[in-house]
């Protein structure tokens, strides 16, 4: 069986940013709080003594968590700012899907499909290298056209746009039309009937 120290470390690791209270850890490990306190002190000493670990134990308001040592703050701040390590929002995923299937497409055309402004999502997707400007549309104002990049293909794990899942155009149009059915309730009171 694993040592109390290893089991404690595993619990704290899984708890992540939320951390765990003394009481919760004692219950889960089935040990008294005094024994737990000693294990926490040992774990902290282990982290402090090991120059090859980036981890330390943090206690705040009787909640304990495993965090990175303050020495790594600048490195981790720089890492978190890199576009590839930020997740895509739902809006960005919607825009990316629209661009992938309808490319080349203008921002206004994306906005028309979504019903909201997509400028922020387009800028984010460009910063991530997932979409690019693909010329200008021959129309009033000569708006930018957007298309996906080779990195987009790598990002979603395909070799060409031909591998995108086919969307039946009629099914898509039916779904769009059903949103605006004539028999749809005009106000919330009709939903109760």
UniProtKB/Swiss-Prot annotation:
It holds the Pfam family SMC_ScpB. The keyword S-adenosyl-L-methionine does not apply. InterPro entries: ScpB_csome_segregation (IPR005234), WH-like_DNA-bd_sf (IPR036388), WH_DNA-bd_sf (IPR036390). It is found in: Cytoplasm. One of its GO terms (biological process) is chromosome separation. Keywords: Cell cycle, Cell division, Chromosome partition, Cytoplasm. GO terms for cellular component: cytoplasm. Participates in chromosomal partition during cell division. May act via the formation of a condensin-like complex containing Smc and ScpA that pull DNA away from mid-cell into both cell halves. Homodimer. Homodimerization may be required to stabilize the binding of ScpA to the Smc head domains. Component of a cohesin-like complex composed of ScpA, ScpB and the Smc homodimer, in which ScpA and ScpB bind to the head domain of Smc. The presence of the three proteins is required for the association of the complex with DNA. Belongs to the ScpB family. HAMAP family: ScpB (MF_01804). This is Segregation and condensation protein B. It comes from Streptococcus thermophilus (strain CNRZ 1066).
């Amino acid at each position: 069986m694993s040592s109390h120290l290893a089991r404690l470390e595993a619990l704290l690791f899984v708890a992540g940013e939320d951390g765990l209270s003394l009481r919760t850890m004692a219950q889960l490990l089935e040990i008294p709080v005094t024994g737990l306190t000693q294990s926490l002190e040992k774990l902290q000493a282990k982290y402090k003594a090991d120059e090859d670990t980036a981890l330390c134990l943090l206690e705040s308001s009787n909640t304990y968590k495993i965090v990175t040592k303050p020495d790594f703050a600048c490195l981790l701040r720089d890492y978190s700012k890199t576009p590839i390590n930020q997740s895509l929002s739902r809006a960005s995923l919607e825009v990316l899907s629209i661009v992938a299937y309808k490319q080349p497409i203008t921002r206004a055309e994306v906005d028309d499909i979504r019903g909201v402004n997509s400028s922020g999502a387009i800028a984010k997707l460009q910063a991530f290298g997932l979409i690019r400007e693909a010329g200008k549309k021959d129309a009033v104002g000569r708006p930018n056209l957007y298309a996906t990049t080779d990195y987009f293909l790598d990002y979603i794990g395909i070799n060409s746009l031909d591998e995108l899942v086919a969307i039946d155009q009629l099914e898509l149009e039916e779904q769009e039309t059903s949103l605006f059915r004539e028999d749809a309730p005009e106000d919330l009171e009709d939903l109760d009937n």
